[in-house]
């Protein structure tokens, strides 16, 4: 079964927004830091999906459409990565899905785990984020 997802790399003041995923065994990388976004609904474009997911997960709509950055293929999974600016302070976001959200620096991204203020513990970065982190560190 082919599966497509669309994820958002959102930057604000030199830091990137991450989501601490729920601790649910039914999801990919439970309890790991990842990007906001999710699956494509039937007949939905990747761009439509990433914008819908941002509303559903953090109640935020970008002022301008996010830019398609790259697409990766891993077996039956196609991941569309979008990039753009987070135009509001993180405190203005409403976390509706996941355990925490955080703006992270390049230094934190290199460490492999990130501290969660809400959970009061460090949690690992999702292994699937490797490609995104490598590209961010090159920029």
What are these regions (language model features)?
Residues 1-18, 36:
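Conserved N-terminal beta-strand and adjoining loop/helix that marks the start
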Residues 1-3, 11, 27-28, 74-77, ...:
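A generic fold-level signal
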Residues 7, 32, 100:
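Conserved beta-strand and immediately adjacent loop positions that scaffold enzyme active sites
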Residues 15-56:
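Conserved Nudix-box catalytic region and its N-terminal flanking loop in Nudix hydrolases
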Residues 39-64, 69-122, 139:
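Unchanged
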Residues 131-136:
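Acidic/histidine-enriched, glycine/proline-rich intrinsically disordered or flexible terminal extensions
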């Amino acid at each position: 079964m082919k599966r497509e997802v669309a994820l958002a790399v959102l930057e604000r003041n030199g830091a990137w927004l991450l989501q601490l995923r729920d601790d649910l065994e039914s999801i990919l990388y439970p309890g790991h830091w990842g990007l906001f976004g999710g699956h494509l609904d039937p007949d939905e474009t990747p761009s439509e999906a990433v914008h819908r997911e941002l509303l559903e997960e953090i109640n935020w709509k970008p002022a301008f459409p996010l830019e398609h950055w790259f697409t990766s293929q891993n077996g039956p999974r196609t991941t569309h990565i979008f990039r753009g600016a987070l135009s509001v302070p993180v405190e203005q976001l409403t976390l509706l899905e996941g355990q925490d959200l955080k703006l992270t620096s390049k230094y934190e991204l290199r460490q492999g785990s990130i501290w969660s203020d809400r959970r009061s513990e460090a949690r690992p970065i999702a292994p699937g984020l490797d490609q995104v982190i490598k590209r961010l560190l090159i920029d």
